[in-house]
């Protein structure tokens, strides 16, 4: 029984050592086999006189492509108005319902105090019953969960 396990482990190590070579050879053999099968099938079909026609695209696809490029190739019959000058206010900035816009307010320079301390108020205050700051006892750190 001992000799069987020794032979089994040496055979397994041989497969493990040559795995990539075996895999490459298997891929090549399968590819060549499938290629030969397809070659024989095509040759047999052509001997029988069967002609394969190349599939043509459907006509509605060509019409769609023509429609897609129609506006680019042909000038549109409707004459568009010229573009406004660049410094002209855009329609997005103001809508026609608004009253005439007032000139922007002018601001004066504010003298800043350089050594002034500012106090910041946090926007989020933790609730008192929040358990993030609770200390964990030392004897539970080593326990596995």
Curated annotation (Swiss-Prot):
Residues 104-145 are annotated as: Interaction with TLR4. Residues 74-107 are annotated as: Disordered. Keywords: Cell membrane, Cell projection, Cytoplasmic vesicle, Lipoprotein, Membrane, Palmitate, Phosphoprotein, Transmembrane, Transmembrane helix. GO terms for biological process: cellular response to molecule of fungal origin; positive regulation of cytokine production involved in immune response; positive regulation of dendritic cell cytokine production; positive regulation of ERK1 and ERK2 cascade; positive regulation of interleukin-12 production; positive regulation of interleukin-6 production; positive regulation of lipopolysaccharide-mediated signaling pathway; positive regulation of stress-activated MAPK cascade. One of its GO terms (molecular function) is molecular adaptor activity. Residues 81-86 are annotated as: Proline-rich region necessary for constitutive interaction with LYN. It comes from Homo sapiens (Human). This is SLP adapter and CSK-interacting membrane protein. InterPro entries: Immune_Signaling-Apoptosis_Reg, SCIMP. The lineage of its organism: Eukaryota, Metazoa, Chordata, Craniata, Vertebrata. The chain crosses the membrane at residues 19-39.
